[in-house]
């Protein structure tokens, strides 16, 4: 079974509803014109999901809509949280889970992330499990140990037949302008696939898409596309401008 390719944009805490609609009015036609092999998606803030959902539907676009996080319970006394049923009202296709900013700023633990991954998968929303090492980890030579643990613990609640996407984002490369070499990225992705084969099976590991994120731009997207174990991109800052993001999508799909 051939792995699917994805290029997702993570808007983080950027764009109002009006700004999101303006973005999509420009970006959706770009995507239609490029007609990429990759599935293209955006993960806006919670407050812009409604506007994005409306715009995507209005323009009859194939763009996937994603969320940046979710609570593992469907309802309850969890002030400030958002549930999967709430996301599904906006036809959300995927949800980012375990992003390094959630891990390090908000102290999300692997056990909680695992519950979120399982809940998303059971609800029919594709979980995108984000993993990555810090600069300290990289320099200490323990990158593979950290990534292996994040995969094993983060996927502990995933139903056996459910779909999942992995996004490798080295923390030291997010928003820093530092970019991992294509050789380094391929080595890490191949290692992650090996870990996935131990968690599941060799056959299933070959069906799981692994995305790369970390200062991805239009001028390095094509290089990552040549890596056999890089199945897509998770794009941060370069996804905020419709023309720039379209160039990233186009270059990854040359």
From Swiss-Prot:
A Pfam match:
TIM
Q: Where in the cell is it found?
A: Cytoplasm
Predominant cellular place of this UniProt entry's protein? cytoplasm
CDD domains in the record = TIM (cd00311)
Q: Which GO terms describe its biological process?
A: gluconeogenesis; glyceraldehyde-3-phosphate biosynthetic process; glycerol catabolic process; glycolytic process
PROSITE patterns named among the record's database cross-references: TIM_1, TIM_2
Against InterPro entries, the record matches this protein to:
Aldolase_TIM, TIM_sf, TrioseP_Isoase_bac/euk, Triosephosphate_isomerase, Triosephosphate_isomerase_AS
Protein keywords: Cytoplasm, Gluconeogenesis, Glycolysis, Isomerase
Please name every pair of cysteines joined by a disulfide bond in this record. none
- Output a single Gene Ontology CC term carried by this record: cytosol
Q: Which residues are annotated as active site?
A: 99, 169
Cite the EC number. Answer: 5.3.1.1
The Swiss-Prot or TrEMBL record annotates one GO molecular function as: triose-phosphate isomerase activity
Q: Which reaction does it catalyse?
A: D-glyceraldehyde 3-phosphate = dihydroxyacetone phosphate
Binding sites annotated in the UniProt record for substrate: 10-12, 175, 215, 236-237
Provide the family line.
Belongs to the triosephosphate isomerase family.
NCBIfam families, sorted: tim
The subunit structure is: Homodimer.
Role this protein plays: Involved in the gluconeogenesis. Catalyzes stereospecifically the conversion of dihydroxyacetone phosphate (DHAP) to D-glyceraldehyde-3-phosphate (G3P).
- Protein name, per record: Triosephosphate isomerase
Taxon lineage = Bacteria, Pseudomonadati, Chlamydiota, Chlamydiia, Chlamydiales
